[in-house]
Amino acid sequence: MASVQQGTPAETNGAASANTIGVENPATGDLITTIPVLGADQIRAMAGRAREAQPQWEAIGFDGRARVMRRAQKWMLDHADRVIESVVQETGKTHEDAQLADLGYTVSALGFWAKEAARYLADERVPSWNNPVAAGKKLIIRYAPVGLVGVIGPWNYPIANSFGDCIPALMAGNTVILKPSEVTPLSSLLMAEMMRECGLPEDVFQVATGDGTTGAALIAEVDCVMFTGSSRTGKAVMKAAAEALVPCYLELGGKDPMIVCADANLERAANAAAFYSMNNGGQVCISVERCYVDESIYDEFVQKVTDNVRGLRQGEPTGVGTVDVGAVIFPPQLDIIDEHVRDAVAKGAKVLTGGHPRPGPGRYFEPTVLVDVDHSMKCMQEETFGPTLPIMKIANAEEGVRLANDSNYGLQASVWTSDVEHGEALARRIQAGVVCVNDAQINYTALNLPMGGWKTSGMGTRHGSGGIRKYTKIQSLLITRRALKREPFMFPYTARQTRLLRAFFKLVYGRGKRD
């Protein structure tokens, strides 16, 4: 991987930055390569080229843009091993996690937006009958591209949650500059290579490598920002976007609760709890981060989950099927995970399995199950983002809902019960942007279903109509086809004209029911 290219000369403005960042393999600690930290002048030059390229990209229409996306879909499948290996090397995640999300989600999204973008962004006719003054006029809502979109991606899914956000923005007719995480930039550069090979015009999609200063410079140059990351960084992004007076959309932290009712399918719920808390090393924005279990099934549930988690294989992913849980991708995250576990133990929690950073090369935290937890502990209140599962005993589902809502976060939640009608009723009371019944995380694959956070978990949505319309400007059109030389309300004002208009208002609006 030492020969990885940091973009084309066009993407780096023909010169490497004086500053570089090393990209490591978290599974081994080995240096893969270095990437340049692009500065404000380079970002400004990239933005200028993107703005020049945008009108032509918009002009080729939905069909032309869709052809590029479908070619990219085929390219990813034809080069699946290379795509997966790129993700695995810079994240230390398992081949299976990389295939399921970074590859599987992205090829699905390329096809979905290629097919659905035109429908979501088609002109909408609006009825004019509700106001006599506008009666007979042609009213249209039009969705126009914002122009240049800046996407600031996270490190946990360097393709799915970085390039994945670029796809609808591109299909809407925008140009895009993607600033990937400095920890995992290589897969984004691979996506830039893919798009060039698939016929995307020059400068329509560019990758800006660098650190937080690069992201700040990007926000100052674009017309719209999409950010995925922590709530703390999201607030800084929102502040910078406000200074630039550009819209921003945020997918931020989560502390997703799982409520297991007394009548739940215990085997399925236990398997799901183990998987959806540990997949991708627990580094999933919609990971199960806290679990509330009815006291009548608590002991059996805890035993099943603990047995499952204790048997998970962790280590360097040397091939398919070699490990179940990979590395901790972001270096500071290892300390956060450890801090949350130590805080819980100090306050009375018990570790049933795991509980420690794993010694040796690479960054790992043992898959961990905690019990005897409560809401005084960080592991139940703050985003852990690691392979841990705190399980709390509850009296009933009502207590579970109350505790689920006792959080600053509201990204996702799940309810597990054999009574799906009761489960849906509980779901509607949980303060989260997405709630699943007898499932978790799978909603992310339903690309026609909006996904977004409440509370401090974000603003705006991915997927569905809102997932592409956020990258547009709404233009309203009113067209008068048969016009009078002079409307009755135009100058000059006369007493007779005023009386007639008053009578007209009374005739039209005065027949409503009186309280």
Task: Name each model-derived stretch.
Residues L31-L38, A53-A59, V151, M258-V260, ...:
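Short, well-ordered beta-strand elements within core beta-sheets of diverse protein domains
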Residues A18-I21, V288, L411:
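Short loop/turn microsegments at loop-to-beta-strand junctions
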Residues C224, R232-D374, V437, T498, ...:
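ALDH superfamily catalytic-core signature
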Residues M1-K137:
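N-terminal Rossmann-like NAD(P)+-binding subdomain of aldehyde/semialdehyde dehydrogenases
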